[in-house]
């Protein structure tokens, strides 16, 4: 199963987890502190560790965390756990981040998301925010036995493969596929222009092809529309209109709706299936899918970054943004020198 490739037994990560309330349905670490990246991140001595905690009851979890880690929160802590949870659930991409926290001698940023919100994002790509993080190799530190969550995690990976294949030609390499997958959650993200280094996707994939393969190998082997030449690192996908229609029909619901919105002329109000049938026969099918992905990511990334001003506080937001801009500047200097 693809999810087995996500598990980690890292003692250091579990030591950090011990500083937080235990009621987690899922906890995972991601980013350059977990998996080596090329570019500016490769030269950071102590990169910040990124973590996400998934909780069944955000109000109860934040209440416990405020008692244990009061200093982690911005001034929103004065309004109590219910307001914090309301901000978490109702604004941005449904996740509440506390950045620039020293924990067990390590600089970390952690986000909190409700289990229900995460499952919705994994299945439907409402925001493609945390779901996008989980399309790339991560280290799962803790996960409960929820079959619903595990099925949603697996479905998210399958959706990432299908979406990427629709944007690729009939024949392509493993690396081509992994680059498309890694780029999904950055497609349309304004931070790829402001702050984040533009070559970020390549920097993520190239040093981690083995980890991407571990994550997706079983899905690629079982896909009935795909020929996976594993030893050659090459793949072929059915690009017939019938094949593409089958692929489009399995896409996450929100992505299908965005495709329908892009293609449906004013006044027609066609149903989604009719639109997908048209797109399947369109030579620009891949471009339509790419545009639809961007139309999900762009607004959610803007909303989440704006929300960060309130959840992190102005001072931390300025420091965090400066770190991001510094990474972009170092990458630019390295390219031009």
UniProtKB/Swiss-Prot annotation:
Broadest EC class assigned to this enzyme: transferase
Tissue-wise expression: Brain and liver.
Subcellular location: Mitochondrion inner membrane
Pathway: Phospholipid metabolism; CDP-diacylglycerol biosynthesis; CDP-diacylglycerol from sn-glycerol 3-phosphate: step 3/3
Cofactor dependency: Mg(2+)
Reactions this protein catalyses: a 1,2-diacyl-sn-glycero-3-phosphate + CTP + H(+) = a CDP-1,2-diacyl-sn-glycerol + diphosphate
Assigned keywords, A-Z: Lipid biosynthesis, Lipid metabolism, Magnesium, Membrane, Mitochondrion, Mitochondrion inner membrane, Nucleotidyltransferase, Phospholipid biosynthesis, Phospholipid metabolism, Transferase
Domain of life: Eukaryota
Entries under InterPro entries matching the protein: Tam41
Keyword Transferase on entry: yes
Functional note: Catalyzes the conversion of phosphatidic acid (PA) to CDP-diacylglycerol (CDP-DAG), an essential intermediate in the synthesis of phosphatidylglycerol, cardiolipin and phosphatidylinositol.
Family of this protein: Belongs to the TAM41 family.
Designated name of the protein: Phosphatidate cytidylyltransferase, mitochondrial
The organism of origin for this protein: Rattus norvegicus (Rat)
Lineage, broadest ranks: Eukaryota, Metazoa, Chordata, Craniata, Vertebrata
């Amino acid at each position: 199963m693809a999810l087995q490739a996500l598990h980690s037994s890292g003692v250091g990560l579990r030591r950090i987890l011990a500083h937080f309330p235990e009621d987690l349905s899922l906890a995972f670490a991601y980013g350059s502190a977990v998996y080596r990246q090329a570019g500016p991140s490769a030269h950071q001595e102590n990169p910040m560790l990124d973590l996400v905690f998934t909780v069944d009851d955000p109000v109860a979890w934040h209440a416990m965390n405020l008692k244990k880690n009061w200093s982690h929160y911005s001034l929103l802590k004065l309004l109590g756990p219910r307001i914090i949870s309301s901000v978490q659930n109702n604004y941005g991409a449904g996740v509440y981040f506390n950045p620039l926290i020293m924990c067990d001698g390590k600089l970390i940023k952690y986000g909190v998301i409700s289990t229900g919100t995460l499952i919705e994002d994994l299945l439907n790509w409402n925001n493609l925010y945390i779901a996008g993080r989980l399309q790339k190799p991560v280290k799962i530190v803790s996960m409960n036995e929820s079959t619903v969550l595990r099925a949603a995690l697996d479905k998210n990976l399958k959706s990432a493969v299908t979406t990427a294949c629709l944007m690729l030609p009939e024949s392509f390499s493993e690396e081509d596929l992994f680059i498309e997958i890694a780029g999904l959650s950055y497609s349309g993200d304004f931070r790829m222009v402001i702050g984040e280094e533009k070559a970020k996707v390549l920097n993520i994939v190239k040093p981690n092809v083995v980890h991407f393969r571990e994550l997706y190998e079983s899905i690629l082997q079982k896909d009935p529309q795909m020929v996976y030449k594993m030893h050659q690192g090459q793949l072929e996908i059915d690009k017939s209109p019938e094949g593409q229609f089958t692929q489009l029909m399995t896409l996450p619901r929100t992505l299908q709706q965005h495709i329908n919105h892009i293609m449906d002329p004013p006044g027609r109000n066609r149903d989604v299936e009719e639109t997908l049938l048209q797109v399947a026969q369109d030579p620009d099918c891949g471009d339509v899918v790419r545009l639809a992905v961007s139309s999900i990511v762009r607004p959610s990334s803007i909303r989440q970054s704006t929300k960060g001003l309130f959840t992190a506080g102005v001072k931390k937001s300025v420091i965090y943004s400066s770190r991001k801009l510094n990474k972009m500047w170092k990458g630019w200097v390295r390219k031009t020198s």
